């Protein structure tokens, strides 16, 4: 059994925030694999289903991001899921929009949701780091992650969430590298078509050959000479 945690903040005011891409990914998974309905438990929302032949519990903590570890720890302990079998889906500033990285363990990288989980369960869980890009200035980070995705972001957001769901059985089976590679392949922009070389132009027809008049004068003079020869013969 796996515990798959999507991180975000509860409530409609935060629903489309960049910080809530983990919630969005969990929602797509639950719909794609026809999980049971969301229900309130473990200070969060929980849904159950099967992915790749494995029982999966999806969890969206409702504690607000900074206290996510309370909900994750409560679920993991009640369900007796070891930390090794927890997968956390979260937003990642240091990964480009539309890209992702997968890793096990490591630091929280300034992410308060991960810090909270670390404080309750340690760091040895898997993280799917869903790229949202960086605003370029640390002072802008808080406003950036709590701002809604733009309409234009749907061009990469929808494909990457679909690709994560489509490829999730590979992650369930433990093939983290294969999962990341496959998602990258599914979300890669199409290669531009190479322009075909222009067809070689057919050679221009040779100019018509015009016979030059006999040497020694004009055409009229040539005719006059010929007539003179005829008269002499007579």
From Swiss-Prot:
Site (Discriminates between blocked and unblocked aminoacyl-tRNA) location in chain: 9
Annotated GO CC locations: cytoplasm
Subcellular location: Cytoplasm
Catalyzed reactions: an N-acyl-L-alpha-aminoacyl-tRNA + H2O = an N-acyl-L-amino acid + a tRNA + H(+)
Pfam families with a match to the protein in the record: Pept_tRNA_hydro
EC number(s) recorded for this UniProt protein: 3.1.1.29
Primary residence: cytoplasm
Annotated Low complexity bias: 199-214
Keyword Lipid metabolism: no
GO molecular function list: peptidyl-tRNA hydrolase activity; tRNA binding
Site residues, Stabilizes the basic form of H active site to accept a proton: 91
SUPFAM superfamilies, per the entry: Peptidyl-tRNA hydrolase-like
One record GO biological process: rescue of stalled ribosome
Residues given in the record as tRNA binding sites: 14, 64, 66, 112
Keywords per UniProt: Cytoplasm, Hydrolase, RNA-binding, tRNA-binding
Active-site residue numbers: 19
Region spans: Disordered: 187-217
Function: Hydrolyzes ribosome-free peptidyl-tRNAs (with 1 or more amino acids incorporated), which drop off the ribosome during protein synthesis, or as a result of ribosome stalling.
Similarity annotation: Belongs to the PTH family.
NCBIfam families linked: pth
Subunit relationships: Monomer.
Protein name according to UniProt: Peptidyl-tRNA hydrolase
Gene from which the chain derives: pth
